[in-house]
């Protein structure tokens, strides 16, 4: 089976200078992949020519005349730039010409346009960015990592349901454990949104283990950690900054003297393994969960190596049938949760807003 993906080549801080080289390298390593490069045709062709890949049959150019800038308001991306590389790439997924879209573009715009073009799964009001973060024994699924800066309690419950379904589908766990990210484990901690979300989670049939703190993220305390997009994005980027700082400190210390340089040579295999484990670029690419099609969000600042990993996330998701498995697990979970009988003022599948697909407002999204 050929895996067909659309690439928003104009998205991110660096545009085609990063996205096109990453795409070329990816198809050369994955002969069953076909990438549709969406964007300003002349800019894409210039990069392909430089890479001697103009005639590569695994790559095709899909012209788009507009670009969603990283600082564009959601309304501009959604209502004015209807021929943007982001919109065209998503339209090809909607029309069945590709199985997933990968973009490093403006997060808020990507969330809003994806939601409008592709629609959400039944019972889901807002998509959430989800990713598996490493822990000592495996991975912890965390969401939301930046799609929704302001959330209501029922949105956090829905994120938990999606995280539960994804872990159940991919890892075969019947009862994945759920934690709510907070400033303390006690139920009295947190703002009113967090407290109310905790009440909804405790009242649900999910395997909710209570509040978790920031230092639990990489411990493997629970299978799924739920938070709003503001908190999740700050936590993620803080982690990346810390990993980079540790790498820089080790490099600096081993370069201080001739003796330390000799020690570095002896320790080189260990140092290389350490560098690989803490290199956040290999963790680039997070799924926008809750949509009827697959969308992978890359960091806007990603280099070609990191963006290639984002493409791989989309490729692997298609190969592993993630969307189909998630949809089935969500349907099964909806039945187990009582088909929306949460006492949440509209939380869960019975929410009057669930499944509503009017154009989202800027207040619901972030641009980070």
Curated annotation (Swiss-Prot):
* A Pfam family assignment: FA_synthesis
What EC number(s) is this enzyme filed under? 2.3.1.274
Where in the cell is the protein located? Cytoplasm
Could you name the domain of life of the organism this protein comes from? Bacteria
User: Biological process GO annotation list?
Assistant: fatty acid biosynthetic process; phospholipid biosynthetic process
- Region named Disordered: 335-368
Q: What is its main location?
A: cytoplasm
Q: For this UniProt entry, what's an example GO CC term?
A: cytoplasm
For this UniProt record, the keywords arranged alphabetically read as follows: Cytoplasm, Lipid biosynthesis, Lipid metabolism, Phospholipid biosynthesis, Phospholipid metabolism, Transferase
Classification via Gene3D superfamilies: Isopropylmalate Dehydrogenase
The record lists the catalysed reaction(s) as:
a fatty acyl-[ACP] + phosphate = an acyl phosphate + holo-[ACP]
What GO terms are given for molecular function?
A: phosphate:acyl-[acyl carrier protein] acyltransferase activity
Kindly tell me the pathway this chain contributes to.
Lipid metabolism; phospholipid metabolism
Residue spans of biased composition, Low complexity class: 349-368
Subunit (UniProt)? Homodimer. Probably interacts with PlsY.
Q: Which family does it belong to?
A: Belongs to the PlsX family.
Known function = Catalyzes the reversible formation of acyl-phosphate (acyl-PO(4)) from acyl-[acyl-carrier-protein] (acyl-ACP). This enzyme utilizes acyl-ACP as fatty acyl donor, but not acyl-CoA.
Know the name of this protein? Phosphate acyltransferase
Phylogenetic lineage: Bacteria, Pseudomonadati, Pseudomonadota, Betaproteobacteria, Burkholderiales
Quote the gene name from the UniProt entry: plsX
């Amino acid at each position: 089976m050929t895996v067909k993906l659309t690439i928003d080549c104009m998205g991110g801080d660096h545009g085609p200078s990063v996205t096109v080289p990453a795409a070329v390298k990816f198809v050369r390593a994955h002969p069953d992949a076909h990438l549709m490069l969406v964007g300003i045709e002349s800019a894409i062709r210039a990069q392909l020519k430089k890479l001697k890949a103009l005639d590569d049959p695994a790559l095709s150019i899909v012209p788009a005349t507009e670009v969603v800038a990283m600082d564009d308001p959601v309304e501009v991306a959604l209502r004015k730039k209807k021929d943007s590389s982001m919109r065209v790439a998503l339209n090809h997924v909607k029309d069945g010409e590709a199985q997933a879209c990968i973009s490093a573009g403006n997060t808020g715009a990507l969330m809003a346009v994806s939601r409008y073009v592709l629609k959400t799964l039944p019972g889901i009001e807002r998509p959430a960015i989800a990713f598996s973060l490493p822990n000592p024994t495996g991975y912890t699924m965390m969401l939301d990592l930046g799609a929704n800066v302001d959330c209501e309690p029922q949105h956090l419950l829905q994120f938990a349901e999606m995280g539960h379904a994804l872990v159940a589908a991919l890892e075969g766990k019947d009862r994945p454990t759920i934690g709510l990210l907070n400033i303390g484990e006690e139920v009295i901690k947190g703002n009113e949104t967090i407290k109310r979300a905790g009440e909804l989670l405790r009242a649900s049939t999910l395997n909710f283990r209570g509040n978790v703190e920031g230092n639990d993220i990489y411990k493997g305390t629970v299978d799924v950690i739920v938070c709003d997009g503001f908190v999740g994005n700050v936590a993620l980027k803080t982690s990346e900054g810390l990993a980079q700082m540790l790498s820089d400190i080790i490099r600096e210390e081993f370069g201080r003297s001739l003796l330390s340089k000799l020690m570095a040579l002896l320790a080189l295999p260990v140092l290389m393994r350490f560098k690989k484990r803490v290199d956040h670029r290999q963790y680039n690419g997070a799924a926008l969960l809750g949509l009827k099609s697959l969308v992978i969000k890359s960091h806007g600042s990603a280099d070609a190596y990191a963006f290639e990993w984002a493409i791989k996330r989309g490729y692997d998701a298609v190969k592993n049938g993630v969307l189909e498995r998630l949809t089935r697990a969500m349907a099964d979970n909806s039945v187990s949760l009582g088909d929306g009988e949460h006492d949440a003022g509209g939380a869960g599948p019975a929410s009057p807003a669930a499944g509503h697909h009017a154009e989202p407002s800027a207040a619901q999204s972030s641009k980070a």
